[in-house]
Amino acid sequence: MNQTLRTGVWIGALCVAWTLVMGFTGWYKDPALVNAFFLVILVEVALLAVGLRKTAATQGYGRQVLTGTLMAVVAAAIIFCGSLLFTTVAFPSYFQDVRAAQEEMLRAAGKTPAEIEAAVQAAAAGQTPLANALAGVAGTLVTGLLASLVIAAFHRKR
């Protein structure tokens, strides 16, 4: 397996694994711990740095950016599938749980029932398995491109 594919698979697998940790521990329901999910960004950036370091000897800046972006594409495909499985099979009540946690956070912030209802309704449109999976893909691709632009400046053939 080439380095691009290997790194992309590792990124995707570790991000899905962390998502499952968030699910099985129930952290996604806890307002104090829900942001721990964003550790996936650090995982992606760190593994992109490792992967691009391994391809740096033979590739210039542009090729390194392309390679890093392709690593993110591979990861995004795995994350898309993992996200769909997470919200439809492993945790089918995920969106109801997220709504309940959102309501709790808004109540704790002193919002009125009308404000809470408006916020929950506004968020509801994006709370579907497909929308959630596509958001994961978009986040992975954007992070991959931006991180690759920076990492390639330091790890490339000169």
Task: State each model region's role.
Residues 104-128:
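Short membrane-interface loop/juxtamembrane segments of multi-pass integral membrane proteins
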Residues 82-109:
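Functional transmembrane-helix hotspots
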Residues 24-29, 85-90, 154:
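Helix-loop junctions at the membrane-solvent interface of multi-pass transporters
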Residues 129-158:
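Transmembrane alpha-helical segments in integral membrane proteins
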Residues 2, 6-10, 66-75:
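Alpha-helical transmembrane segments of multi-pass membrane proteins
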Residues 1-52:
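Transmembrane alpha-helical insertion/packing segments
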Residues 14-22, 44, 75-79, 83, ...:
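Alpha-helical transmembrane segments of multipass membrane proteins
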Residues 52-64:
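Membrane-helix interface/capping segments
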